[in-house]
């Protein structure tokens, strides 16, 4: 689940989370994301980090050829949906080098805890064309639990938006990242640095991965960090 605190106490902040529908434009598609703050809380609203990470992917900052991606703590599923749409768009233009490329055989897996899955599935099904839905899987994943349902090193790209907040989840999240990553995998984490514990997680991450900040959105105060296993080459 997208584990972030609700900090916006102004009336304006409340209004944006209580809107039942938010509309975005990515990958030449109009995406309509349902929200349900009242019943599902933080897992069912679109956080700024998800918007910034989706924009970063659309910028073509990551190049993938015939590889697979997974979103952790997907919540509403915006990032995973955008990744899947970019996969479709890019597969239509295989000669376009500087964009996010997913070819046949690639797939996107969008994950969250069981309590959020039905809501997540509804957003994914509503926003992905039927012919690419078979390439997109919504799957339960509670960090640190039942990792055997995923093959070790299964994914080339691991995505997370505002998933580093609760300290009690840090060890499980690191264990999950370690399991899902191979030596060539790339992790992209988008987050706000709200508290010292957020920096503590990054320090923990650096013990197992090479970490660097690759993007900052000053308007939304969101950082994007890229991480790769330390025993791999610097370049993907």
UniProtKB/Swiss-Prot annotation:
Subunit comment: Interacts with heat shock 70 family members; at least some of these proteins are methylation substrates.
InterPro entries documented for this protein: Methyltransf_16 (IPR019410), SAM-dependent_MTases_sf (IPR029063)
Organism field: Pongo abelii (Sumatran orangutan)
Protein name: Protein N-lysine methyltransferase METTL21A
Entry annotated with the keyword S-adenosyl-L-methionine: yes
One Pfam family here: Methyltransf_16
Entries under Gene3D superfamilies matching the protein: Vaccinia Virus protein VP39 (3.40.50.150)
Phosphoprotein recorded as keyword: no
One of the record's GO molecular function terms: Hsp70 protein binding
Catalysed reaction equations from the record: L-lysyl-[protein] + 3 S-adenosyl-L-methionine = N(6),N(6),N(6)-trimethyl-L-lysyl-[protein] + 3 S-adenosyl-L-homocysteine + 3 H(+)
Residues at which S-adenosyl-L-methionine binds: 47, 73-75, 112, 143, 161
GO BP field: protein methylation
Any one cellular-component term (Gene Ontology): protein-containing complex
């Amino acid at each position: 689940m997208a584990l972030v605190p609700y900090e916006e106490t102004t009336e304006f902040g409340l209004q944006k989370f209580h809107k039942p529908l938010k509309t975005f434009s990515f990958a030449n598609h109009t995406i309509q994301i349902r929200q349900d703050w009242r019943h599902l809380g933080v897992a069912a609203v679109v956080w700024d980090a998800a918007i910034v990470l989706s924009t970063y992917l659309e910028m073509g900052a990551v190049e993938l050829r015939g590889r697979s991606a997974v979103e952790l703590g997907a919540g509403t599923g915006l990032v995973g949906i955008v990744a899947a749409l970019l996969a479709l768009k890019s597969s239509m233009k295989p000669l376009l080098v500087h964009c996010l490329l997913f070819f046949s055989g690639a797939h996107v897996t969008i994950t969250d805890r069981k309590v959020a899955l039905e809501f997540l599935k509804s957003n994914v099904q509503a926003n992905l064309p039927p012919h690419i839905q078979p390439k997109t899987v919504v799957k339960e994943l509670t960090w640190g639990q039942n990792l055997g349902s995923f093959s070790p090193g299964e994914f080339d790209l691991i995505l997370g938006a505002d998933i580093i907040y609760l300290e009690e989840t840090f060890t499980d999240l690191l264990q999950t990242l370690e399991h899902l990553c191979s030596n060539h995998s790339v992790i992209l984490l988008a987050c706000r640095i709200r508290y010292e514990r957020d920096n503590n997680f990054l320090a923990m991450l650096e013990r197992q991965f090479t970490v660097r900040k690759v993007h900052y959105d000053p308007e939304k105060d969101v950082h994007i960090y890229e991480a790769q296993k330390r025993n791999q080459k610097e370049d993907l």
